[in-house]
Amino acid sequence: MAGEWLAYGELGLATIGFAPFALHRWSCSKWIKNGDLVCPEEMSGLEITILLPVWNESLIIEKKLSNLAKQDFKSHLVIIDSASTDDTVSKSETWLKDFPEAFESFEIIRMKERLGKTFAVKQAIDSIARKDGIIVMTDADATIMPGALTRINRWFSNPNIGAVGGTPNRQGLLQGEIAHRSIYTSTRLGESNFDSTPFLEGSLLAWRANMVKSSDLYGKANADDAQIATAVRLNGLRAVQDNELVFTDLMPTTRRGQRRQKVRRAQGLIRLLVRNRKHWFSKRQGRFATILRRNAWMHILSPLAITGAAVLGLLRNLTYLPETNLMGVLSVIEAYCLVSWMLVRVNKPIFGFRIAGTIMCGLENLLVATIVSGRGKSLHMWEQHTDVRLALSEK
């Protein structure tokens, strides 16, 4: 009897943990199918200012500037350097002097010390507060597609659009990242069609200049891009991801580097959702409250629920034989989840196990991020993925 109670407890916690993923995936598919989110054909008439945060990017800064200069929409450029210890700034200055016609104007802001990317973005927002039009933030390791700035400009001819994010074409050999990115992108597109997504990609993110203030961002947390997207929506306009606005970047080349990146990102998203908990059930936010609430469920409650289910399952299997049909079925499901997780963990996902394994690994990263946060450690000051920079420089 006790074993059966453990089984019921495990089943209840597993349902709590997995239900939001199934519900939100179904909802997002429906929202995409029924959505009418389309990029306008007309230009907005607004100027564009590119915001480029950098730190020790000497290997790739010239390639990044060249990529931006090839855009068919001439823009202003603001580089904010987080106290680089290499020659990022000097290379930038030399390149800009060699190609003076590449941008309408340029400015390099030098921070006295490195405080993390979010602090850098906050300082840059204050510095360009006098500018009108559109701010386009992009990362040094991202290559944006031809015509990206023109497409961004067209989006803002819709007065309801406050922020637009690009969709990654992530290159690399880690199959788990490909599966994760597919799920993540479809979720963001579904949320965008329904109302807004709280999570956009900082590798290519645009917003109306007057929609975000530095005070909207919490400096001692990462996920500055998601903070901006959420702030835009809470300030009254939509934040959407465009599936045809594409940028290319490289995933970390090792599983360890990938997990480090995922845990850092997970902590930033969890902290963002917790800070905005008053909006989870806000009638004023309407549909966006539903999106925030479900993401909070998936990012905060689900990892804890699945961990609890795993503990109960372990206790049951160590203590009791499968005495009932329920216990036998749960043992099979446990084996499936364990195998799925292990296959994705070692970068060997196979059909039928890929989605489940991707979700399990995502829950693992969220749990680790929760534990790290609970210990009082912030990951907003992160170590650079030097393998990615080296690979990009050799292309």
Where do the PLM segments sit?
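Short, acidic, metal-binding catalytic loop of nucleotide-sugar glycosyltransferases
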Residues: 66-75
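Short beta-strand-to-loop acidic/aromatic patch adjacent to the donor-nucleotide binding site
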Residues: 131-143
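Long helical/loop segments within the catalytic core of UDP-sugar-dependent glycosyltransferases
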Residues: 118-120, 124-126, 132-133, 146-220, ...
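A conserved acidic beta->alpha catalytic loop
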Residues: 67, 81-91, 113-115, 142-143
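Conserved donor nucleotide-binding strand/loop of the catalytic core
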Residues: 78, 89-127, 167, 175, ...
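N-terminal membrane-anchoring/stem segments of glycan-assembly enzymes
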Residues: 1-42, 365
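Basic/Trp-rich segment in TM-proximal cytosolic loops or flexible interdomain/linker regions
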Residues: 2-3, 31, 255-257, 261-330, ...
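Catalytic donor/gating beta->alpha subdomain of glycosyltransferases that bind UDP-sugars
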Residues: 156-184, 220-224, 228-292, 361-372
